[in-house]
């Protein structure tokens, strides 16, 4: 009798959503990407079972405001798009930016060249030109700017752009080289002016720059490709004394300045402490940028929480992540779900840090990292290249990586890897201005995050990395619905208020 009563109770609670939906105007949509082959496939709520995982959403408990999700505009990606047919070029950009696609809302690009450029270049190569009278972004008008403009035309809601320099022009540096070295003191003001001129030049092209990072990977990259070194003290002083005041003088004070821009972990904590302990400098910093390369599984929650405490109310944005040190696997979905990928640390990490770099499944790493970051105050998450070729380039240093979309220009072929769909589970449904919300979860093996969107909808992303299926009962307010999530699968559940559906 007790077992019968329990089953009847489960049946009632799991189908309450339908009955209440008719009364309150709420509905539920479920989308799934899985190792078994689903790719953002829309599903129906499932039948209940005994022993379900229970997740209670707590919309009244709010955390950071979401800035967005997306990828990066690089010269390599832009060049490849230009090698494809018009139809395939449009297909890719629509997949990333249109209302029917992933709806990317936060992006990044490079100031001057980076390793994912066709070669090394800067906007002013005239040595000693302190007033930057020869400054020009003409190089970017060949590939990069056309790609951004096309994306703008396809994006209904628009998107933000963060711009990052890998290096100043060599003539501004103490080693007169694209790689390594430091900014010479006599060129600090010229370098600040360089940022301002870049922002204004892009605005003249119809492209607003929302934010800047002061330097991509200021700790360096072993001088392999474009880089310039900063200590946290030097970055703090440069922003306080030069970059911040320059942008303010030029009426660009609304542009968000993000500090650090390298890996999470102990270094992040040291940088956050130094950058934000100086009140005058902190007034110019809008937040912190981080990368994911310090580990293939650890998102360093303690470091993210520490950074949040050091800079409450300011941004923490993951500005770069990718499957590095791997040539892309062409039309092999299974590989992206398999624990076969290695990263730079697999071979090159110091012995005491090797444990942070085991082999991993790319989809797992993406989902785990984004969920972990969101649950620890990160408000934006940006992937690296949007498009690469079958070699993992073009990259002038041969630093091959994988992107969510891989192309073969010679055959005019396009491959949307499972990473594209993984990104879309977040970018398409958790919108700018959303608030991350609290939840209770009875199964720690089931990863999830949840957010309340500005239109009143609730988005919940579930990730089941395990080998067994799960049935999950999701409840909020007086509503409850069930979803069956298979092993090795991601689901987004969208609770939508019918009266607001026209806003999507």
For each feature predicted by the language model, list its residue ranges.
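Bacterial Sec-dependent N-terminal signal peptides
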Residues: 1-25
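Carbohydrate-binding surface patches
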Residues: 428, 439-477, 488
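Aromatic/acidic polysaccharide-binding cleft in carbohydrate-active enzymes
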Residues: 318-421, 438-441
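Conserved, mostly hydrophobic/aromatic
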Residues: 71, 103, 161, 212, ...
């Amino acid at each position: 009798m007790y077992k019968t009563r329990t089953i009847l109770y489960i049946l009632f609670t799991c189908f309450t959503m339908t009955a209440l939906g008719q009364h309150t105007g709420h509905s539920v949509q479920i989308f799934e990407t899985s190792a078994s082959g689903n790719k953002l496939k829309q599903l129906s709520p499932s039948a209940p079972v005994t022993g379900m995982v229970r997740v209670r959403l707590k919309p009244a408990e709010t955390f950071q405001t979401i800035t967005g999700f997306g990828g990066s505009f690089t010269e390599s990606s832009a060049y490849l798009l230009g090698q494809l047919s018009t139809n395939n070029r449009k297909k890719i950009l629509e997949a990333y930016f249109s209302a029917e696609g992933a709806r990317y809302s936060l992006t990044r690009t490079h100031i001057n060249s980076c390793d994912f450029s066709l070669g090394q270049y800067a906007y002013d190569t005239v040595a000693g030109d302190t007033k930057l009278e020869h400054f020009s972004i003409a190089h970017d008008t060949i590939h990069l700017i056309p790609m951004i403009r096309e994306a703008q035309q396809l994006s209904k809601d628009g998107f933000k752009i963060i711009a990052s320099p890998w290096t100043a022009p060599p003539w501004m540096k103490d080693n007169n080289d694209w790689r390594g070295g430091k900014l010479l003191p006599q060129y600090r003001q010229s370098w600040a002016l360089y940022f301002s001129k870049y922002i204004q030049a892009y605005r003249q092209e119809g492209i607003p720059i929302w934010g800047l990072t002061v330097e991509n990977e200021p700790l360096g990259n072993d001088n392999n490709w474009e880089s310039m070194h900063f200590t946290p003290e030097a970055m703090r002083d440069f922003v306080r004394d030069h970059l911040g005041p320059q942008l303010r003088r030029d009426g660009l004070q609304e542009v968000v300045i993000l500090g650090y821009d390298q890996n999470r972990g102990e270094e992040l904590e040291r940088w956050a402490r130094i950058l934000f302990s100086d009140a005058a400098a902190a007034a110019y910093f809008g937040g912190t940028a981080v990368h994911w390369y310090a580990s293939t599984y650890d998102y360093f929650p303690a470091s993210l929480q520490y950074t949040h405490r050091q800079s409450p109310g300011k941004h923490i944005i993951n500005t770069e992540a990718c499957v590095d040190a791997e040539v892309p696997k062409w039309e092999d979905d299974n590989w992206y779900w398999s624990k076969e990928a290695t990263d730079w640390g697999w071979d090159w990490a110091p012995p005491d840090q090797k444990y942070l770099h085991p082999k991993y499944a790319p989809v797992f790493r993406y989902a785990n990292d984004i969920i972990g970051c969101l649950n620890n105050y990160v408000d934006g998450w940006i992937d690296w290249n949007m498009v690469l070729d079958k070699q993992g380039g073009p990259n002038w240093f041969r630093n091959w990586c994988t992107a969510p979309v891989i192309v073969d220009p010679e055959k005019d072929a396009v491959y949307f890897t499972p990473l594209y769909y993984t990104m879309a589970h977040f970018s398409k449904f958790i919108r700018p201005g959303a608030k991350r919300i609290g939840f209770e979860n009875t199964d720690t093996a089931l990863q999830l995050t949840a957010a309340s969107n500005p239109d009143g909808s609730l988005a919940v992303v579930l990730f089941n990395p395990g080998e067994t299926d799960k049935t999950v009962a999701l409840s909020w307010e007086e509503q409850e619905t069930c979803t069956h999530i298979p092993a090795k699968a991601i689901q987004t559940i969208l609770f939508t208020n019918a009266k607001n559906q026209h806003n999507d």
